Amino acid sequence: MDQYLHHDLHALLPGRGVASRRHALGLVLGAGYAAAAAPVLAQQAIATPVDGLVAGEVSFAVNGAQVYAYRAAPQGRTGLPVVLVVSEIFGVHEHIADVCRRLAQAGYLAIAPDLFARQGDPMAYGEVAKLMSELIAKVPDAQVMADLDGAVQWAGAHGGDLNKVAITGFCWGGRITWLYAAHGPVKAGVAWYGRLVGQASALNPKHPVDIAAILKAP
């Protein structure tokens, strides 16, 4: 793994602080920039209030399995546009939940399903390499697409407008954003640094570059 990416990913692991991130910035951009950025990096994570929202864990069945998700939506409203929120390799942690709350405060029903639960708990790993090889690499794209379909159906039954569905995802979830934009009833997608290419396999038969021609959503 690239040394800079390794430092950055290591800093994102549960229990790691901003010191590792500052170290990575120093490696890449020089100590001067890192010193200037340190006060910003040291700030606490954003915590969006739940005032006026209904927020928390929900579940739905997909192919005989129970899938759990975090959802947030404006309280007492229906006909809401839906946003699927897809995490990076670390699963549905507090930042992902907060993204849902931010979207809900803006008038959306946001739902972030736990797409790794059948294979294990990403938060139980302390090393990125082990997390990737022992858990992430074992998650089939077909399973992920089905779970996202289930999340959409749940949203439609709980105040969401299925004519207004969007998806956003981070890193691993960015790749999934591209794939689901070609698979599901999506009007728009926003992929944050998602992987576009890769080796085809039984679990990951296609990558975003392979389905680019059939993407219809912006």
Model-derived features with residue positions:
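Gly/Ser-rich "nucleophile elbow"/oxyanion-hole loop immediately N-terminal to the catalytic nucleophile
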Residues: G126-T168
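N-terminal twin-arginine translocation
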Residues: V18-G26, Y33-A47
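N-terminal cap/lid segment of alpha/beta-hydrolase-fold proteins
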Residues: Q44-Q75
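Short beta-strand element of the alpha/beta-hydrolase
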Residues: G79-E88
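Short amphipathic alpha-helix adjacent to the substrate-entry channel of hydrolases
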Residues: E94-P113, A117-R118
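N-terminal secretory signal peptides
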Residues: M1-A19
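Gly/Ala-rich beta-loop-alpha elbow adjacent to hydrolase catalytic centers
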Residues: G169-G173, T177
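The feature captures the conserved acid-bearing segment of alpha/beta-hydrolase catalytic domains
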Residues: Q199-P218
